[in-house]
Amino acid sequence: MNFNKKTIEDIQVKGKKVLVRCDFNVPLKDGVITDENRLNGALPTIKYLVENGAKVILCSHMGKPKGEPKPELSLAPVAKRLSELLGKEIKFAPDNTVVGENAKAAVAEMKDGDVVLLENTRYRKEETKNGEEFSKELASLAEIFVNDAFGTAHRAHCSTVGVTDYIDTAVCGYLIQKELKFLGNAVETPEKPFVAILGGAKVSDKIAVINNLLDKVDTIIIGGGMAYTFLKAQGYEIGTSLVEEDRLDYAKEMIAKAEEKSVKFLLPVDHRVAAEFKDVEATVTNDQNIPTGNMGLDIGPKTETVYANAIKDAKTVIWNGPMGVFEFENFNKGTIAVAKAMADSNATTIIGGGDSAAAVNILGFGDKMTHISTGGGASLEFLEGKVLPGISALND
């Protein structure tokens, strides 16, 4: 995939109508936005366009309204809060058809530097099917398309891909530019030693990532529920821990492949365990084996040291997926240890979105990381080496 895409700075935007696909899929509680990270992430691109005299038309999805208007998933609260953050009025066009009379009238009245926000693009059934009609309607509003929603870049929808069939100038905003710079460089030209840390519950979710990264990394660190499938494949006792029986052969194969490529494949050497899936006091095992009747819920203290040392020696580190059941206070120690080791390191540190991003932010290490990806599924597909339709649709 080509990572050198044209950006907003490569084109003339003054006086032009610019449709910007943002990611405003934010959590709401009683109409109030509870996490503003994505709004703040969109500001640099919006500010640049406003300051350079563009007529800025913003669009985004929120939640899964399943192709029909749901008042609780309206973007009205986003328009209100974004206006405050931007320090400038954003006109909201409340059309259930997204591109309706309100939107057309609002866009027709725009002056240079004005901002309009359209309604939730997923109010339209065709959005997720990349339907031609809705793509044309969105495109009819603008002369330039800017994609700045990395979180949906792996989806071929009307507002991410379809519009580019009808608008010739399609470029990326600052957010996608940053994702391409850090994730793209890490995957294609990382500074070595390159360490990938993979956690989370299932091996099956990370198969393609491990496959792709084995050709690029020096060390792979495995934690979370997926570690027990690898340990069982090597003959260790795992008690009642999570295991994917149908992936044991694959796990053996991966370990052999890593050895063949001289990639260090680090698995836990001890665990924090409990008799049931509850936030109870942890018992620490002596070694890789987990006693009968117990389940592994986090990596142990010896493992933390081994993993921290591997991170300390790295020049590039990518992390995707927690080391244990992070929601339980007794079993979040491994995740904290990895986050701390990354925060203390001099390497380029990249958090691959999703749970790891949430963990790092909750722990207060967010500002110590080089880059925290804004895409969960998109980051994973990127690390799998897949072409992301929302990126490939933009001008080279």
Curated annotation (Swiss-Prot):
Pathway(s) of this molecule: Carbohydrate degradation; glycolysis; pyruvate from D-glyceraldehyde 3-phosphate: step 2/5
GO cellular component, one term: cytosol
The keyword Transferase appears for this protein: yes
Gene Ontology terms for molecular function: ADP binding; ATP binding; phosphoglycerate kinase activity
Chief place where the protein resides: cytoplasm
InterPro entries membership: Phosphoglycerate_kinase (IPR001576), Phosphoglycerate_kinase_CS (IPR015911), Phosphoglycerate_kinase_N (IPR015824), Phosphoglycerate_kinase_sf (IPR036043)
Gene3D superfamilies in alphabetical order: Phosphoglycerate kinase, N-terminal domain
Keywords annotated in UniProt: ATP-binding, Cytoplasm, Glycolysis, Kinase, Nucleotide-binding, Transferase
Reaction catalyzed: (2R)-3-phosphoglycerate + ATP = (2R)-3-phospho-glyceroyl phosphate + ADP
UniProt cross-references to CDD domains, sorted A to Z: Phosphoglycerate_kinase (cd00318)
Biological-process GO terms, alphabetical: gluconeogenesis; glycolytic process
Residues the record lists as binding substrate: 23-25, 38, 61-64, 122, 155
Localization per Swiss-Prot or TrEMBL: Cytoplasm
Residues the entry annotates as binding ATP: 206, 296, 327, 353-356
Subunit structure: Monomer.
Similarity comment text for this entry: Belongs to the phosphoglycerate kinase family.
Protein name according to UniProt: Phosphoglycerate kinase
Species this chain originates from: Clostridium botulinum (strain Eklund 17B / Type B)
